[in-house]
Amino acid sequence: MESTTLSKPFKNQVNPWGPLIVLLILGGVNPVTLGNSPHQVFNLTWEVTNGDRETVWAITGNHPLWTWWPDLTPDLCMLALHGPSYWGLEYRAPFSPPPGPPCCSGSSDSTPGCSRDCEEPLTSYTPRCNTAWNRLKLSKVTHAHNGGFYVCPGPHRPRWARSCGGPESFYCASWGCETTGRASWKPSSSWDYITVSNNLTSDQATPVCKGNEWCNSLTIRFTSFGKQATSWVTGHWWGLRLYVSGHDPGLIFGIRLKITDSGPRVPIGPNPVLSDRRPPSRPRPTRSPPPSNSTPTETPLTLPEPPPAGVENRLLNLVKGAYQALNLTSPDKTQECWLCLVSGPPYYEGVAVLGTYSNHTSAPANCSVASQHKLTLSEVTGQGLCIGAVPKTHQVLCNTTQKTSDGSYYLAAPTGTTWACSTGLTPCISTTILDLTTDYCVLVELWPRVTYHSPSYVYHQFERRAKYKREPVSLTLALLLGGLTMGGIAAGVGTGTTALVATQQFQQLQAAMHDDLKEVEKSITNLEKSLTSLSEVVLQNRRGLDLLFLKEGGLCAALKEECCFYADHTGLVRDSMAKLRERLSQRQKLFESQQGWFEGLFNKSPWFTTLISTIMGPLIILLLILLFGPCILNRLVQFIKDRISVVQALVLTQQYHQLKTIEDCKSRE
C-alpha cells in the first residue's frame, strides 16, 4: 500500500454495516430487462477489460439472462496491457502473443536473442511481463507464502469505503479495502461481487512460463451477491496490487456483460401461408403453425407399420414421450406437474443446433420416402449448422454455413435431429438436389409444442382465487430440453444402464413425434387435389377438435386454450380430469379446515354474502335508532317541557303586572 503510517495486515477488516449497505444499493438498481420472457436465450459474452476499458479476455455462450456465471480465467499480464510501465506491456495490444525472448543466459556468456535477466531479482520496478523469465518470477511472487496479491472493489463499494481512494491508488489507498485475493492474511468479504485466486499452481505455471506463454492465469468467480446484481452490462471495476516489499505495484481491471439477441424466430418450409399468419405487430414474431394432426396412429418402436390408432392414443403417446424425456433430464420438475397440448398452432418447434452429420455415397435407410415430411416448421430458434445457399432472411439461424462439394452423396442428420429445409423436414439431404435447386437446410432438434405448468398455477386457475397482474410465462419442452440432443441424450450418456435408459426414453419421444407427423403427412397427401396451402392450414387447425374430444372424454383438463395432463413420478395420469377434481377437492378441504366458522359460513353460502351486504346498512341504522332513540326522545321532551314552562311563567308574570297597575290607579283615586 502507499500509506506509510499503516502496517500490512494479517486479516481483512470488514465493516459490519457492509452487507446492509450493499443490499440497499442493489435494491435501488433497475435491472436490465430484455424481452418479456425470462427464459429467452441470448448470446452472452463476459468480457474482462484492462484499465483503458479494452477487452483483453472474453468467453461467449447462449443462455437465458442472469443464469450463466462461468469462471473467468484471464492472465494477470493481460490485465496489465497498456498499464503502468513497471509491467512492461504499456505498448502491447490486446490479444497479442506474449513478448519474448523465450530463453535466457547468465551474466557471463550471452546468447543472441536471449534475455539476460534470468538471475536478476524481481524488484518493485522490474518489468514483470515483458519476458518469459520475468513472468516466471511474477508467478513465484503470486504463489509465495509471504507474497501474493490482493484486490479492492471500485465504485460499486459501499459508502463507508470512500477512504479506499480511486483509480490512482487502484482503489486500495488504505488497509481494509481489500475484499479478495491470494495473500497470507486471506482477504475476504461478505458483500463483494467476485473472488480472485490463482488458476495454476506454481509447479504448473513453471513449464508454461518457460514455453513463452501467458502463465499467470487467474480464476475469477462470481459470489452470491455478484449473481444477484443485474448491472453487469455497464460493468464493474477493481484494483489489483501485488504484495511485495516496498511499493505495491498495481493495475485496474473490469468485468462487463455483453448481451446480444440470439435472433428472431424464423419459419422454414414450403408453405408461405403459414409464415404470414403471425401478427406483424408483435415485437417477437408469434408462432405460426407447423404440423398437426387429423388421422391417428399408435407409437410402437419396433413395428415398421404400426396399426392405425385413435386420436387418444396418438396424442397421449406424444405427451408420454415428452414426460419421459423431461423426467430423465429434470426429475425435480416431474414430481408433480401438468403437461399441456396447445389447441392453436404451432404444434412443433425447432431448435437449431451444431452437429456432425454423416456422409454417405448411397442413400441410408433413414432416407426412405416414409420419413420425409413436406411440412412447414414455422418456428426455429437458436443458431446451428446450415447447408446450401441460405438467404439473408434466414442467415440469423446459422452459426456455421457449409458449402457442398462436387459429387452425389447424402448427408444424414445425427440421431435425434433432422434437417429443416425450404422444401420440408427430412432426416437426410441429397447434395445433387441442393446443386440443382436453391434449397437450403438447417440442422434442428424437433420438439412437440408441449407446455409445462406447475400444479399451483393450474389449481389457482380453476379456483379463481389468484389474480395475476401479468400472465406467467409458459415453459415449453423446447425451452426445457432444447440442445440436449447434441449434449448426449441421443448418443447415450457414458456407458451402461444410464445410457440405455436415456436412449430408449428419448427414442420413445422421437417415435411418437414421427407417428404424429406421419399421420399429418398422410392427410395432406389425401388433400393434395385442393389448394396445398389452404389444406395444410385447415388440417393443422383440426388439432383443436382432437383436443376437444380428449376433454369431453375426461382424459385432459381444459385450461384456457390448452389440454392438460397430470403427471408425477409414477407417470402420466390417464384420467386427468378426475385427478384435477380430486386435487381441487383436497385443496378445498384443506382451505376450509384452516378457516374459522365465520369465514366458512360465507364461503359455503355465496348468496349469504350478498344478502348481508344488502341489509347491513338498514340494520345498523335501525340498531342505532333503538339504542339512542329513547335517550334523544327524552331529551327532546324535556327540552319542550322546559320551553313550555318558561312561556307559562312569562304569561303569569305579564298578568301579575297588569293587576298591580289597576290596583295602583284605584288607590290614587
Curated annotation (Swiss-Prot):
GO terms for molecular function: metal ion binding. A lipid is attached at residue 631 (S-palmitoyl cysteine). The record marks 470-471, 650-651 as: Cleavage. A motif (YXXL motif) lies at residues 656-659. Keywords: Cleavage on pair of basic residues, Coiled coil, Disulfide bond, Fusion of virus membrane with host cell membrane, Fusion of virus membrane with host membrane, Glycoprotein, Host cell membrane, Host membrane, Host-virus interaction, Lipoprotein, Membrane, Metal-binding, Palmitate, Signal, Transmembrane, Transmembrane helix, Viral attachment to host cell, Viral envelope protein, Viral penetration into host cytoplasm, Virion, Virus entry into host cell, Zinc. A motif (CX6CC) lies at residues 556-564. Residues 266-310 are annotated as: Disordered. GO terms for cellular component: host cell plasma membrane; membrane; viral envelope; virion membrane. Residues 502-538 form a coiled coil. The mature envelope protein (Env) consists of a trimer of SU-TM heterodimers attached by a labile interchain disulfide bond. Disulfide bonds join 77-129, 103-118, 104-114, 152-172, 164-177, 209-215, 337-340, 337-564, 367-421, 386-398, 428-441, 556-563. The chain crosses the membrane at residues 612-632. A motif (CXXC) lies at residues 337-340. One of its GO terms (biological process) is fusion of virus membrane with host plasma membrane. This is Envelope glycoprotein. Residues 32-611 are extracellular. The gene is env.
